[in-house]
């Protein structure tokens, strides 16, 4: 299965009539492996800050997390494994695997829990596959 298929079928899937606004699978250095059409372009320093937060949980909390210059308030995640952010009525979930970052960005009517479920389920599967 191609990386694009994972994005199209597993991240941009229909959940109770809703879907993520955008999603992607990136390498740890920020290289895009696959992405949905509307996925924003991360800046290198944004990826570096996200990776630092995985290594040093809490690093982003005081300043917030920036994604394509949009600022997200960092909310409870799983230290070293999942970073979650909130911005207005939407948010972001980033799951780290051995080689990749699985990213989902949502807005209402999708809920944070639905976004978390979709992103973390694929991330857990990739971890099980050694990726």
Curated annotation (Swiss-Prot):
The protein's assembly and partners: Occurs in many kinds of cells as a complex with monomeric actin in a 1:1 ratio.
**Listed GO cellular component terms?**
cell cortex; cytoskeleton
Its localization reads: Cytoplasm, Cytoskeleton
Task: Reproduce the miscellaneous comment text.
Answer: The variability of the residues taking part of IgE-binding epitopes might be responsible of the difference in cross-reactivity among olive pollen cultivars, and between distantly related pollen species, leading to a variable range of allergy reactions among atopic patients.
- Post-translational modification, as annotated: Phosphorylated by MAP kinases.
Which family does the record claim for this protein? Belongs to the profilin family.
Function (record text)? Binds to actin and affects the structure of the cytoskeleton. At high concentrations, profilin prevents the polymerization of actin, whereas it enhances it at low concentrations.
Positions bearing Phosphothreonine: 111
Position of sequence motif Involved in PIP2 interaction: 81-97
Does the keyword section mention Transcription regulation? no
Please provide, alphabetically and separated by semicolons, the GO molecular function terms listed in this UniProt record. actin monomer binding
Cystine links in this protein are 13-115
- Give the matching Pfam families: Profilin (PF00235)
Q: Which UniProt keywords apply?
A: Actin-binding, Allergen, Cytoplasm, Cytoskeleton, Disulfide bond, Phosphoprotein
Q: What is this protein called?
A: Profilin-3
């Amino acid at each position: 299965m191609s990386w694009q298929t994972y994005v199209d079928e597993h991240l941009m899937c229909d959940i109770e009539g809703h879907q993520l606004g955008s999603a992607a699978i990136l390498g740890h250095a920020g290289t895009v492996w696959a992405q949905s059409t509307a996925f924003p372009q991360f800046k290198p320093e944004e990826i570096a800050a996200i990776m630092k937060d995985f290594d040093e949980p809490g690093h982003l909390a005081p300043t917030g997390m920036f994604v394509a210059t949009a600022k997200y308030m960092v909310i409870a995640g799983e230290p070293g494994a999942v970073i979650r952010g909130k911005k207005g009525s939407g948010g972001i979930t980033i799951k780290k695997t051995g080689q990749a970052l699985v990213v989902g960005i949502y807005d209402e009517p999708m809920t944070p829990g639905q976004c978390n479920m979709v992103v973390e389920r694929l991330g857990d599967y990739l971890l099980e596959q050694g990726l």
